[in-house]
From Swiss-Prot:
InterPro entries: Epimerase_deHydtase, NAD(P)-bd_dom_sf, NAD(P)_dehydrat-like. It holds the Pfam family Epimerase. It is an enzyme of class 1 (oxidoreductase). The gene is adrE. This is Ketoreductase adrE.
Length: 336
C-alpha cells in the first residue's frame, strides 16, 4: 500500500469491523491486520475459533472480539466504538426470520442498526472515518444490455413498488435503504467523521476458515457437487474477488483522496459457461460439474465508477488491475 504517512488513520490504530465472522468481513479484518492495524471485531455470539485463527495468522494481541447480539438496542455499539479510530460496518442487520417479515419492517430493522452505530460513533472523537458495506443493488440492479450505473445511481424499485403494489426482495430493499439512510443521517447530523461506502457485486474467492460461510462463493462451490442453484441468478451479475473488495474497504477507510464517496467493487461481466469451463479445467475428473446453461449472455453495460476503484487498487496496493475470474475461482475452491 502507499506510504503509511499518507493514511488518514495511522498504522497501529484500532479499527472496528462489524460481523467479523462473515465472508467479506473476515477478509477486511485480515487486510487491516496485514497493514499493521489492530482490529476489534463484533460477532453476535462468542466465536473463540475466530480469535484463534487471526492470532495464528497475525500474532497475539492484534485482534479482539466483542459480542454485540442485538443491533436494535440504542446502546448496542456504545462499548465497541470506544478507543477505535475507524469503523467498517459490514454486518447486514436483517431480522432472524426474514421470510416472515414485511419489507417495511425489515428495512426499518436494517436502518436502525446503521443509525445506532453512527450515533455511537459520533460520541467518540477518535473516530475519523466510517465505511459502510453496501451492495450493487443499492445503485440499481441492471436488467439487460446497455445499462449504465454511476456514482449517483440509486435503485428506485422501492418507490416503484409503492406505486404499483409489487414487492421487492428483502435483501435488496435492506441494502437500498441501509445505504440511502446512512447518507441522509450524515447529511442531516454532520458528524465529525467522514462516511464512505463500498458496493460489491457477486463476490468470489478464498474462504479463510471452514466456519466462515462462503456467501456467494458457497453457491459457486456447489457447482462442483452438481448444484445448479447459481444458474438462477438472472440477469447475470458481474463478479469481483473478495480480496479486491476487502482492499477497497481499507482504501475507503485510509485513503485521503476518498471522501464522501461510493466505491463500486465490480470487476467484469461473465457467464456461467465461463465458470463451468474454468471449474472443469481445475477439476477435470469431476463428473458432477454440470453443463453450462444454453443461450446465456453476459450482462453488458457500464459501471462508470468501477474504473476509479480499479485505479485505486493499482495505486494503493500495486495491483495490475482487478483479480481475474480464474484466479478468484481457483482460490475459492481450494478447500473443495
Amino acid at each position: 500500500m502507499t506510504q503509511a504517512q499518507n493514511y488518514v488513520i495511522p498504522p497501529g490504530s484500532k479499527v472496528l469491523v462489524t460481523g467479523a465472522n462473515g465472508y467479506i468481513a473476515s477478509h477486511i479484518v485480515k487486510a487491516l491486520l496485514d497493514l499493521g492495524y489492530l482490529v476489534r471485531g463484533t460477532v453476535r455470539t462468542p466465536m473463540p475459533w475466530l480469535a484463534e485463527y487471526f492470532e495464528r495468522q497475525c500474532g497475539l494481541g492484534r485482534f479482539e472480539l466483542i459480542v454485540v447480539s442485538d443491533f436494535q438496542q440504542p446502546d448496542a455499539f456504545d462499548e465497541s466504538v470506544k478507543g477505535v479510530s475507524g469503523v467498517i460496518h459490514v454486518a447486514q442487520g436483517l431480522p432472524s426470520s426474514t421470510a416472515a417479515e414485511t419489507v417495511k419492517s425489515a428495512t426499518a430493522y436494517t436502518v436502525n442498526g446503521v443509525i445506532n452505530l453512527f450515533k455511537a460513533a459520533s460520541t467518540q472523537r477518535t473516530i475519523q472515518r466510517v465505511v459502510l458495506t453496501s451492495s450493487i443493488v443499492a445503485a440499481g440492479y441492471p436488467t439487460g444490455k446497455g445499462f449504465k450505473l454511476d456514482a449517483d445511481s440509486w435503485d428506485e424499485s422501492l418507490e416503484q413498488a409503492s406505486k404499483d403494489g409489487t414487492t421487492v426482495p428483502i435483501y435488496r430493499a435492506c441494502k437500498i435503504e441501509g445505504e440511502r439512510q446512512a447518507w441522509k443521517w450524515v447529511e442531516k447530523n454532520q458528524p465529525h467523521f467522514e462516511l464512505n461506502s463500498v458496493l460489491p457485486w457477486l463476490t468470489l474467492g478464498k474462504i479463510l476458515h471452514p466456519n466462515i460461510g462462503g456467501s456467494t462463493m458457497g453457491y459457486v462451490s456447489g457447482l462442483l457437487r452438481g448444484d445448479t442453484t447459481p444458474f438462477k441468478f438472472l440477469p447475470l451479475p458481474w463478479f469481483v474477488d473478495v480480496e479486491d473488495t476487502a482492499r477497497l474497504h481499507a482504501i475507503a477507510l485510509l485513503n485521503p483522496s476518498v471522501r464522501s464517496e461510493r466505491l463500486f467493487a465490480t470487476a467484469a461481466p461473465f457467464t456461467w459457461g465461463d465458470v463451468i469451463e474454468i471449474l472443469k479445467r481445475i477439476q477435470p475428473n469431476n463428473a458432477r460439474i454440470p453443463a453450462a446453461p444454453i443461450q446465456e449472455e453476459p450482462t453488458l453495460g457500464d459501471v462508470v465508477p468501477a474504473a476509479r476503484a480499479e485505479k485505486l487498487l493499482r495505486e494503493t496496493f500495486g495491483q495490475l488491475g482487478w483479480t481475474p475470474l480464474e484466479v478468484s475461482l481457483e482460490s475459492g475452491i481450494a478447500r473443495e
